[in-house]
Amino acid sequence: MNIEGDDEEFYNFNDIKKKRKFTKEDAIYGVFNDGWGDYEDEEESKMTEEEYYKMKKRYSTPVGFVASGIYEPNEHKLKNKDGENIDNDDDDGEEKKKKKKEKKEKKQKKKEKKEKKEKKNKKKNKYGGGGGNNYDDSDNDKSIEDKPVGGIGAALLSKMGYKGTGGLGRDGGGMVEPIKVQVRPKNAGLASVTELNVNSSDDSDDSDQSEGDTDSDNENKRSLGWKKKEPKLKYDFDEHLESTTTTTFKKKTTTTTATTTTSSTPQIVIDMRGPEARLYTGMEEIKHHKHHHHHQHNKEYQNITSILDDQSKPLSELKHNVDLLLKLKQIDIQNQDNKIKHENDKINNLTRGVEKLKLTIENDKEQIKKVTEILETITTVKKQLDQSQLDLKQLYKVFKKLKSNYPKEYQNFKLYNLQKELLEPLLKEKLNQWELESNSDNNDNSSLEISKKLSKEMVKWRQLFQESVSVLGEYQINVYFLIMRDLFLPKFKNYLRSQWDVKKPSNAATLISTWSDTLPDVIQEALLEQSILPKLKVAIEKWDPRTDPIPLDHWLLPWIPLLGSELESFYPLIRQKIISALQDWHPSDKSAIKILTPWKNIFQSNSMDSLLNRAIIPKLSKSIKDLEINPSNQKSPIEIQWLLRWSNLNNNDNNNNNNNNNNNDNNNNNNSITTTDNINLDSGLITLSTIICILEKDFFTRWLKILLEWLKSPDANLEEISNWYSGWKKQFPKEIISNDKIKSIFNISLNLMKKVLSNETIQKDDEILISQKINSLLNTNINNNNNNNNNINNSYQQQNQQQPIKPISSPSLNSSNNNNIDNISTKQMVEQLAIKNGLLFIPSEKKTNSGQQIYIFDKIPIIIERDLIMYNNNNNNRWEPANIQYLLDKSLNK
């Protein structure tokens, strides 16, 4: 194994080597750079690592530049140590040998450096040396001048063939000296540059020498990093005039030859006579110029202009100074003007601010005055309340005054919230004095009067608090709604659930009807659905028409204007109970008419017809069939009166004649239904067409047969027959006699009687005609009755299919335990309703800001607060009150 090679690899892996900077030459040439990879080796060969880092520190110190023109950076490449030029045509073999020697030397140096670094690392590990380069200054012996000087510019020039001396280009015949840049004084014109450009054609040698001299003189100054300020020269105008006058005469003699040579070149003339300086190429242009401005000048000004014309550089510095002074004065004037404007603007702004402050002070005074007045009124009202001298009317006037006189303060300070301190104590006193359980049968109208007065007063408060909203947690609730919820709703619920009797609806119905305009819709619906409907459901299920002394219509129909469609779900149960009660009913009993007449306009026509067809019409037709028709001993036909009183065709005379018989029949009937006597017996429940059909089928067919047999008998007495005929005809009202079928029957009987009077025999044709008539009546009646019955039954079935029983909005209606209806809570009612309809009802993990529990009713978040249900409306993100039916419809219609 090569231990040295392994050590080198381990050393290279652990060594954190400092890389050289990535130069612009590397970016341009990349790997193809000639010096790429060798630069670092050359650096390492020339200096150690400590020297390298120490030299790096010197870059923060001021730099001493080398004078240009003396140092040639690439001169060491072109000369040997003895000063002889290197031949470019040496052999390649010698160069290869030199390179091999250099590589060997480099490898040895690298090994020595690695050994030194290993020793240093061991020392650091022993003594726990930290970061930082602690080098000695003894190694820094070499000067910076030994380094090759030159940046990327020199490298690029060398690539393009520049060798350090001579001109640019491959052959050295290019440009040697670039264009010189000469400094022009600040704010000086072009005329001042002409003298600087006189010596522009001097040789480059002189310039190089001068530059070398200046550079050599200023080396020490530049190394120090600062320059001394040159002394400022003061300009004397008188001395300048004297010097210019003496020098002009000298120049005229010396420059005559020069003017002849330079006559072809244009002479620049500056005309300063006008308000603005003008440039001309010569005096001729001034003479022939069209626009001359003649001005009268003083002698001093004329002398100055003559001097300026003679001189090539006429007082440019003085001119410049005067212009500067003018500009400075203009700037001072503008600054002063701006300051004056700024101060004026400040004054205006301050005056406006003072006015605004005065207005705010006045407004604050007015507000303070209003607030003090409001406080005085509130304190006086509180004193009156404490002394029990305050009434609802007086308090209403105070609130109305506050709202009308101080509308902004009423809304900003939320003065309507004073109802908790002022209004609620008065309302509690009124509610304690109000006894809802007082019965109207005892002639005690005090509670009714109190309720009416209180409802009228609360209507006023409702209008006053219509736009007043109180914030409770996350949602906003109307103030009037809070009053009714907290004070009146518990009072009404307690009365309706515990004290109110269902079969005495006058108190509760009048209570809710009088308070319908006062109570909010949500509270009214909550009372009807949660307190009234459950008790009505229980009472309807317990109601028996045969034993209950109070009819159902007396205590159920008063709720129709308030409940409306909610009672429709009870109608099928009511019809079934009536049909079951009428199974043992006899047509002589009037109670059936009194029971069914109030439901005539409430039940639908199809359902009412089906009830009559199932319970009433068959028994009436049977009673007509059982009617005895005996000419020898004819009794009064009471059965026909039983039939006719189901319509509005009953004759009052017949009713009066048969009252005694009806009473006797009712007394003999054990299964009579008890009713009140306030309903008219001419109910009109059965139509005229059905009554005529019953008479044709069950009465007139038998009546014609008996009349025909009586006329055939030899002992027939025509007077008795005519009296018998007229007696039967009087039993029917005009509406029945005027019917075509009934007319034809009476006409046939008259024809037969006429034949007997004329001593004509009744032939077989007459008998056949009567039998055909009877058969046709029987057939038509049977068909009509069957069609009628089928239509009624079909309509009844369709009604039951089209109108399914709606789920009652109150869960207690669907619950089996109806006896505990007063003790059931709203939460239990909602839970039972959800179970009945297969909906989800669970408590949520979330709660409101006030700590109320949120429940999920089929994906609808609800809150149950004091027997009120509130749901979260997604449209406005508020908690709004809702009834159970609304939640059911919303969840089932999804």
UniProtKB/Swiss-Prot annotation:
Q: Which Pfam families match?
A: G-patch (PF01585), GCFC (PF07842), TIP_N (PF12457)
Which subcellular locations apply to this protein? Cytoplasm; Nucleus
Q: Name one GO molecular function term.
A: nucleic acid binding
Nucleus keyword on record? yes
Which residues lie in coiled coils?
A: 329-449
Query: Where are the annotated segments for Disordered?
Result: 71-149, 187-225, 785-821
Is the Coiled coil keyword given for this protein?
yes
- Give any Gene Ontology cellular component: cytoplasm
| UniProt entry keywords in alphabetical sequence | Coiled coil, Cytoplasm, mRNA processing, mRNA splicing, Nucleus, Spliceosome
A single GO BP: spliceosomal complex disassembly
Q: Where is the composition biased (Acidic residues)?
A: 202-217
Which portions of the chain have biased composition (kind: Basic and acidic residues)? 73-84
Q: Which residues form the G-patch domain?
A: 149-195
Composition bias, Basic residues: 97-126
Q: How does it assemble?
A: Identified in the spliceosome C complex.
Q: Which family does it belong to?
A: Belongs to the TFP11/STIP family.
Known role: May be involved in pre-mRNA splicing.
Q: What is this protein called?
A: Septin and tuftelin-interacting protein 1 homolog
The source organism is Dictyostelium discoideum (Social amoeba)
